[in-house]
């Protein structure tokens, strides 16, 4: 279908820095074109010091909404009129909807991760889960997994206090999920993984300058019944996932999460379902 810009075209976009590398313009614009929707997605390099001006401009220009990425996901909250429950718990926003100048913030990262699991036929309900890392991705994923019925979540991080902070939020707000925080050591991880159903890497090990690194030093700590997941989507198969496959584990990369969070934002802005399989094929072909 031909892609046209008209006087009626609605604008959505991404506020953050740096953002030129983002997959979001490709994902959303191809989805708009495929469905014949009169929207366009652009990126805007916005740092913390000019975030307020950018948000005011979004209102003035009557954009349909926008995504938010680092370094603005926490800083934007005071600039919004309302935030969703999961955004409140997570403490960050990655999607904003503009309805007649009323800005509501959402966090679709955790739900996007759960969508990626669902695409693989996996539900977090009743699962014992181990998460490596305690940054923003870990916080979004852990809280959403708890909301979705996870039985037990253990978060390992070199700085235990960061992991404890996430656990405290879950314990206070979602008491049906048992949580614990611990330091990151191979022996501790091996012990935790013995009873685990799902192991998630929420660190940057495996991507960029860390591409040759893995969160685990040996396959000995894995077992074949374990599902091993990585939030990293480039490369499509991290060193961790290669190691897990050697043991016979089911593996899942971060592509489902990135598409899932985008699909949820797409639905919030347009009311339409993103053609996920079509978008997945396009991204994999790049």
From Swiss-Prot:
SUPFAM superfamilies: Aminoacid dehydrogenase-like, N-terminal domain, NAD(P)-binding Rossmann-fold domains. It comes from the Bacteria. One of its GO terms (molecular function) is shikimate 3-dehydrogenase (NADP+) activity. It is an enzyme of class 1 (oxidoreductase). Its EC number is 1.1.1.25. Shikimate binds at residues 22-24, 69, 94, 109, 233. Keywords: Amino-acid biosynthesis, Aromatic amino acid biosynthesis, NADP, Oxidoreductase. Gene3D superfamilies: Leucine Dehydrogenase, chain A, domain 1, NAD(P)-binding Rossmann-like Domain. Pfam families: SDH_C, Shikimate_DH, Shikimate_dh_N. Belongs to the shikimate dehydrogenase family. Homodimer. HAMAP family: Shikimate_DH_AroE. This is Shikimate dehydrogenase (NADP(+)). It comes from Alkaliphilus metalliredigens (strain QYMF). The gene is aroE.
């Amino acid at each position: 279908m031909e892609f046209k810009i008209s006087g009626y075209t609605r604008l959505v976009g991404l506020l953050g820095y740096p953002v030129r590398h983002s997959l979001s313009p490709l994902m959303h614009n191809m989805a708009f074109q495929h469905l014949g929707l009169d929207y366009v997605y652009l990126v805007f390099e916005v740092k913390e010091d000019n975030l307020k001006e950018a948000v005011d401009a979004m209102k003035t220009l009557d954009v349909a909404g926008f995504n938010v990425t680092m370094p603005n996901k926490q800083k934007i909250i005071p600039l919004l009129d309302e935030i969703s429950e999961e955004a409140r718990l997570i403490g960050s926003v990655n999607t904003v909807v503009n309805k007649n100048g009323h800005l509501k913030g959402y966090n679709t990262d955790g739900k996007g991760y759960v969508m990626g699991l669902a695409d693989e036929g996996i539900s977090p309900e009743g699962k014992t889960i181990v998460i490596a890392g305690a940054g923003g991705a870990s916080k979004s994923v852990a809280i959403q997994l708890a909301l979705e019925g996870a039985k037990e979540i253990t978060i390992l991080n070199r700085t235990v206090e960061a992991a404890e902070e996430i656990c405290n939020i879950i314990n206070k707000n979602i008491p049906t999920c048992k949580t614990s925080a611990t330091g990151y050591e191979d022996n501790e991880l091996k012990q935790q993984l013995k009873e685990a159903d799902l192991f998630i890497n929420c660190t940057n090990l495996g991507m960029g300058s860390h591409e040759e690194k893995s969160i685990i030093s040996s396959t000995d700590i894995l077992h074949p019944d374990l599902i091993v997941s990585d939030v990293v989507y480039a490369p499509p198969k991290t060193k961790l996932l290669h190691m897990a496959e050697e043991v016979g584990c089911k593996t899942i990369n971060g592509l489902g999460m990135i598409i899932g969070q985008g699909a949820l934002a797409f639905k919030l802005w347009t009311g339409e379902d993103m053609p996920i399989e079509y978008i997945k094929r396009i991204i994999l072909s790049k």
